């Protein structure tokens, strides 16, 4: 077992992983989360092979893997919204901390997650 030690201030940003049953479902969820400013971007990886336990059996499915960039403060809303939009009973929604990145990318990420000024 190990732990990550941050020197200085930790990054408040996350990479959120999700799988979806189809490209159409993944696109619908990502576009909704973008419109609601819960994510800054989403990347889709088509046709990953997933193996998992479900109802006492080992299952295999082709799924779409989605990487989304968001923030710690938006994760609960994002997770709740994915649960509302997703077709799975138990959708995969995992958050990984971003420990570092290029300054320009992190500034862009922050700007995308701020409310739109009218």
Residues of each region from the PLM?
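Positively charged, small/polar-rich N-terminal and surface patches that mediate targeting and assembly
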Residues: 2-118
């Amino acid at each position: 077992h190990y732990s990550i030690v941050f020197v200085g201030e930790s990054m408040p940003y996350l990479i959120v992983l999700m799988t979806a049953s189809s490209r159409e479902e993944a696109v619908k969820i990502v576009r909704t989360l973008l419109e609601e400013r819960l994510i800054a971007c989403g990347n889709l990886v088509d046709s990953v092979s997933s193996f998992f336990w479900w109802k006492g059996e080992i299952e295999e499915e082709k799924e779409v893997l989605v990487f989304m960039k968001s923030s710690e403060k938006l994760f609960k809303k994002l997770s709740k919204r994915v649960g509302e939009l997703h077709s799975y009973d138990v959708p995969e929604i995992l958050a990984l901390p971003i420990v570092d990145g290029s300054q320009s990318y992190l500034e862009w990420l922050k700007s995308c997650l701020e409310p739109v000024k009218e």
